């Protein structure tokens, strides 16, 4: 529903058309859905898809986010074709942060109701040719999991990227995204470096300082985010902390036990190392 601009650090509405409107005590949130987005099979994306997705998660405890969703959301209802109302179990002011993207992703990826509602069990459904709202569809993939090829939709202007447009995404009006994007598993460190140096790949992730320096000594076209140390932004926005599974019984469901763990930690030392 909400994406993240990682440069500004601000959320923006993607499938949603706004940042949601709460009632006075934040126990209800009304969300407008952006009109004009089409699934890759041509169907309109609307409130039915959003309501179905959240209720699917709530009703299937095999889905990882089910317990957390039921902890805060009481019900999700369709108001009209492009409006959804969320009723919370308690005051919940951080609604968009919890149910949108704030770091790397979200547990609440809207799925096509007209596809998933036809499945006997959504938790075992192998969606190998997914119908998507984004600009790329799966063109082909390796059954061993070594690579996957994505192709730009012919109607990408009706995808989330095209409909949201340059208001939030950084591209010019006359710019067309790459026709294909190929994600590959490149093997060990030596293989990864060789393929980067020989220009067989465009982007390489999770590179050590030593690997970067070795590759740059063989190919002067290889660059990082910055030309000088630290070469990339070192601030990791991921949360760091202990999470207790309270559903597993003693001793984790005992508040005194959890407080004892917290009080035993050297917070100053943790801050230095984390």
Regions found by a protein language model. Give the residues of each.
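Gly/Pro-rich hinge or "lid" segments in bacterial periplasmic/extracellular proteins
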Residues: 5-7, 102-180, 190-191
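Surface-exposed binding/hinge segments that line
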Residues: 32, 66-117, 135-142
């Amino acid at each position: 529903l909400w994406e993240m601009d990682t440069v500004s650090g601000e959320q923006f509405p993607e499938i949603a058309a706004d940042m949601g409107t709460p009632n006075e005590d934040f126990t209800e949130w009304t969300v407008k859905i952006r009109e004009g987005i089409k699934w890759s099979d041509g169907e309109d994306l609307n409130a039915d898809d959003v309501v179905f997705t959240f209720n699917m998660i709530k009703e299937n405890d095999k889905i990882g986010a089910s317990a957390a969703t039921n902890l805060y959301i009481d019900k999700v209802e369709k108001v009209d074709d492009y409006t959804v109302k969320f009723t919370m179990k308690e005051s919940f002011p951080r609604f968009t942060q919890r149910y949108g993207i704030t770091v790397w992703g979200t547990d609440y990826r809207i799925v096509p109701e007209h596809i998933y509602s036809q499945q006997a069990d959504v938790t075992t459904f192998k969606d190998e040719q997914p119908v998507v709202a984004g600009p790329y569809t799966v063109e082909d993939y390796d059954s061993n999991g070594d690579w996957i090829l994505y192709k730009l939709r012919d109607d990408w202007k009706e995808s989330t990227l095209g409909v949201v447009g340059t208001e939030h995404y950084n591209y010019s009006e006359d710019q067309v995204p790459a026709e294909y994007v190929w994600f590959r598993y490149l093997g060990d460190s030596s293989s990864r470096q060789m393929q980067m140096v020989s220009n067989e790949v465009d982007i390489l992730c999770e590179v050590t300082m030593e690997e970067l320096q070795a590759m740059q000594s063989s190919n002067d076209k290889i660059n990082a985010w910055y030309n000088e140390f630290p070469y990339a932004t070192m601030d990791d926005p991921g949360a760091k902390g202990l999470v207790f599974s309270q559903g597993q019984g003693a001793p984790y469901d005992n508040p005194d036990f959890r407080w004892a763990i917290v009080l035993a930690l050297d917070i100053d030392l943790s801050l230095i190392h984390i």
